[in-house]
UniProtKB/Swiss-Prot annotation:
It is a peripheral membrane protein. Highly expressed in spinal cord. This is SH3 domain-containing kinase-binding protein 1. One of its GO terms (cellular component) is endocytic vesicle. Transmembrane segments: none annotated. GO terms for molecular function: SH3 domain binding; ubiquitin protein ligase binding. Residues 221-239, 535-554, 600-623 have a biased composition (Low complexity). It comes from Rattus norvegicus (Rat). PROSITE patterns: SH3. Residues 1-58, 98-157, 311-372 form the SH3 domain. Its main location: cytoplasm. Residues 221-242, 289-309, 373-487, 511-651 are annotated as: Disordered. Residues 399-434, 561-575 have a biased composition (Basic and acidic residues). The modification Phosphothreonine is found at residue 298.
Length: 709
């Protein structure tokens, strides 16, 4: 027959439920799934929630029903919390009884609800049962409650057996009424401040508030439960006069139904904290028999963390300086030795390191990894002991180690500062002793390394002019066209000088051309004339040739037409040019200016133009250069005029053809649209006719109906 004691009040919500109060005993319980049990109380049978009661074992039940004792005052400990709040019962400890499972707290935890335990690192909890996945029920410092199972580490069964054997040895060597110290919540202190009782595990309270000669003999007998909300436990103790007493179970305030309402409409929120070993809760070992390694010693996590960090420490050398842009970044200078802390940062392409006692991130392509044996050199000082504080602050030792490290860096290549312009990132340089096969992608905020310009030239170079081609050369010209114009139109001998001059001008760039307001004169005016030769015509005198009407720079539209005509009709120009030019022809062509030296030299370089110039009677003798210079200029002027007229007429014809085609397209489109509209109108007209006929028929039917009546 299963019986249970009520731990929380419950008011019946339905007819088949029981109204239970704290302290009542329910009998004839039949366990059912779903969180509800069926039992009998005060002659009435019904259902009740299983997490509002605690199952009672037979031996505990007899003690509860038979023995009662007056309440004892609560004792204050250093924390001010009331301990030993319930009365205790004395029951002789069964020597062969097995201990419960025990676990040690690995992470501190603050309770979120009333039925949860507060965990501190190093506490030992006796596990009552596993209520559900992730939550266990246990006893800690006389209080029963829930705790998260992932905040503790379970002690092995070997330690439990060792604890039992030690208790047996202690009980044999001690008086009959003496209790093992492992069952006491606090140790008693003698007159000299030493503990009177020693056992498997002792917890030390604050010495200032503990009464030295007070002894708490409390035997904690925690009953097993399948529910989760149990908080009180049945305990036994022996007073000074040996009286036996039964405890009045103290109820606990509950805000909701089931598990203390810890999962009501909210996800489970657990706040893990860093492992901090508190000296006040370190267990004390008993030297009798074997020691308890898992329960009595907890390694210092900060020490192990420091050891593992120093074992895998890497170093890198700064090859490019970088100025920190954010607070979490490091300012590194060329040649610094940075201690690597983490290569797997959130931002790809960034590493975390330490320099001069400051930690931060820096771009990985600004540094070079040092070989692994760099850390093993003998001249490095020994590692200082780890500090007790969590904040690692290395003083003069760090700077001294840094200076000694910097004495032995790998040699830097001499050609590193003089980087060529094609290299934009330091990854393209061959990196030695790198563990990564490839460089990661550039992060969004990662800067580019600076460029070193070894040529001392401006950042943007002017466009370099290529060699003079055989065909027509079409490119943008600046204000220097006036300088090139006179020499090319008047003399074929000056081609070499003009080419050298144009190359010099182009190397300077278009922005460096300075316009001149002086009028140009013919270069051959001061030369002596050959005897027996026909003087040049009046239109080719120095005054006429240097007149601003001929040598004025053309407008951009005329310049564009010159390029188009000479590019497409370079061969026609040489065929259509005549050997004799009259004054009237020159005067008629004043509006059209001669071409620039680059285009004229290209147009006259063809084989046809060269043969025509060689066969002309005016250029047969090579007496002077003054008369020969006039022939190519006049030929080119006449050919240019004809070419421009032909090009303009052809352009007009093409434009007219385009307009005709556009008009045809528009007319065709209008025809199609008109046809569609006519069809649509015809269809609508047919529909209207049908509707009208239908209405007419209906009207006739109505008339006939009216007449028949």
């Amino acid at each position: 027959m299963v019986e249970a004691i009520v731990e929380f009040d419950y008011q019946a919500q339905h007819d088949d439920e029981l109204t239970i109060s704290v302290g009542e005993v329910i009998t004839n319980i039949r366990k059912e799934d779903g969180g509800w049990w069926e039992g009998q109380i005060n002659g009435r049978r019904g259902l009740f929630p299983d997490n509002f009661v605690r199952e009672i074992k037979k031996d505990v039940k007899k003690d509860l029903l038979s023995n009662k004792a007056p309440e004892k005052p609560m004792h204050d400990v250093s924390s001010g919390n009331s301990l030993l709040s319930s009365e205790t019962i004395l029951r002789t400890n069964k020597r062969g009884e097995r201990r419960r499972r025990r676990c040690q707290v690995a992470f501190s935890y603050l309770p979120q609800n009333d039925d949860e335990l507060e965990l501190k690192v190093g506490d030992i909890i006796e596990v009552v049962g596993e209520v559900e996945e992730g939550w266990w029920e246990g006893v800690l410092n006389g209080k029963t409650g829930m705790f998260p199972s992932n905040f503790i580490k379970e002690l092995s069964g070997e330690s439990d057996e060792l604890g039992i054997s030690q208790d047996e040895q202690l009980s044999k060597s001690r008086p009959e009424g003496f209790l093992p110290a492992s069952l006491l919540p606090f140790p008693a202190h003698g007159a000299k401040g030493k503990t009177t009782f020693e056992g498997t595990i002792l917890y030390r309270a604050a010495p200032g508030k503990t009464e030295g000669h007070r002894r708490y003999y409390s035997l904690r007998e925690t009953t097993g439960s399948e529910s989760d909300g149990g908080d009180s436990s049945s305990t036994k103790s022996e007073g000074a006069n040996g009286t036996v007493a039964t405890a009045a179970i103290q109820p606990k305030k509950v805000k909701g139904v089931g598990f203390g309402d810890i999962f009501k409409d909210k996800p489970i929120k657990l706040r893990p904290r860093s492992i901090e070993v508190e000296n006040d809760f370190l267990p004390v070992e008993k030297t009798i028999g074997k020691k308890l390694p898992p329960a009595t010693s907890t390694p210092d996590p900060s020490k192990t963390e420091m050891d593992s960090r120093t074992k895998t420490k890497d170093y890198c050398k700064v090859i490019f300086p970088y100025e920190a842009q954010n607070d979490d970044e490091l300012t590194i200078k060329e040649g610094d030795i940075v201690t690597l802390i983490n290569k797997d940062c959130i931002d790809v392409g960034w590493w975390e390191g330490e320099l001069n006692g400051r930690r931060g991130v820096f771009p990985d392509n600004f540094v070079k990894l040092l070989p692994s044996d760099f850390d093993k050199e003998g001249n490095r000082p020994k590692k200082p002991p780890p500090p007790s504080a969590p904040v690692i602050k290395q003083g003069a030792g760090t700077t001294e180690r840094k200076h000694e490290i910097k004495k032995i860096p790998p040699e830097r290549p001499e050609t590193l500062p003089n980087r060529t312009e094609e290299k934009e990132r330091p990854e393209r340089e061959p990196k030695l002793d790198l563990q990564k096969p490839s460089v990661p992608a550039i992060p969004p905020k990662k800067p580019r390394p600076p460029k070193t310009n070894s040529l001392n030239r401006p950042g943007v170079l002017p466009p370099r002019r290529p060699e003079r081609p055989v065909g027509p050369l079409t490119h943008t010209r600046g204000d220097s066209s006036k300088i090139d114009l006179a020499g090319s139109t008047l003399s074929g001998i000056l081609d070499k000088d003009l080419s050298d001059r144009s190359n010099d001008i182009d190397l300077e760039g278009f922005d460096s051309v300075i316009s001149s307001t002086e009028k140009l004169s013919h270069p051959t005016t001061s030369r002596p004339k050959a005897t027996g030769r026909r003087p040049p015509s009046q239109s080719l005198t120095s005054s006429s040739l240097s007149s601003p009407d001929i040598f004025d720079s053309p407008s951009p539209e005329e310049d564009k037409e010159e390029h188009i005509s000479l590019a497409h009709r370079g061969i026609d120009v040489s065929k259509k040019t005549s050997r004799t030019v009259t004054i009237s022809q020159v005067s008629d062509n004043k509006a059209s200016l001669p071409p620039k030296p680059g285009t004229m030299a290209a147009a006259s370089s063809g084989p046809a133009s060269l043969s025509s110039v060689a066969s002309s009677p005016m250029s047969s003798s090579l007496g002077t250069a003054g008369q020969r210079a006039s022939s190519p200029s006049l030929f080119s002027a006449e050919g240019k005029a004809k070419t421009e007229s032909a090009v303009s007429s052809q352009a007009a014809i093409e434009e007219l053809k385009m307009q005709v085609r556009e008009l045809r397209t528009i007319i065709e489109t209008m025809k199609d649209q008109q046809k569609r509209e006519i069809k649509q109108l015809l269809s609508e007209l047919d529909e209207e006719k049908k509707i009208r006929l239908r209405l007419q028929m209906e009207v006739n039917d109505i008339k006939k109906a009216l007449q028949s009546k």
